[in-house]
Amino acid sequence: MMAETRKILGREDIGISPTCVRVPVYTGHSEAVNVQTREPLSPEQCREILSGAPGVLVVDDPNDALYPLAIDVAGRDEVLVGRIRRDPSHERCLNLWVVGDNLRKGAATNAVQVAELLHERGLIRRTETPAPA
C-alpha cells in the first residue's frame, strides 16, 4: 500500500502509515485517512475544498448520522468522503473516512479516465475499426 500510494502521487518522500483490514462486503474499499497539512486547515475548509474536487462527493453530517458507507458507492463512479474532523493529536492533521467502488473507480472508470486524458493531451488518437465484411 505504501509503494502504490507513493507511485500514484509521484512522491517517494511522502509519509504513509497504512493499515489494511479485510471485511466481508460485496464491493467497495473504505479507508480511514489521516492528512497532515502545511498550515492548519479546519474541517469546514476541507469540506469546501473536497466539494469542488471532480469525482468526489462529500457526505458528512454526523448529527444526522450521515456519513459514507461502502454500500452507498456500489455501482457509482464518485468517491464519497465524510467524518471530516480534526485530529486531536496534531493541530495540522485531519481525519477523513473515504469509500469508493473499487470495481468502478479502482478499475473500469479509471481506465476510461486515463484514456480520455491521454486523448486530450494528444498522446493517443481514436482509430476507426473497419466494419466486418
Q: What kind of region is each of these model predictions?
A:
Residues 1-95:
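C-terminal substrate-binding/catalytic lobe of Rossmann-fold NAD(P)-dependent oxidoreductases
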Residues 78-80, 85-133:
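NAD(P)-dependent Rossmann-like dehydrogenase/reductase catalytic/cofactor-binding core
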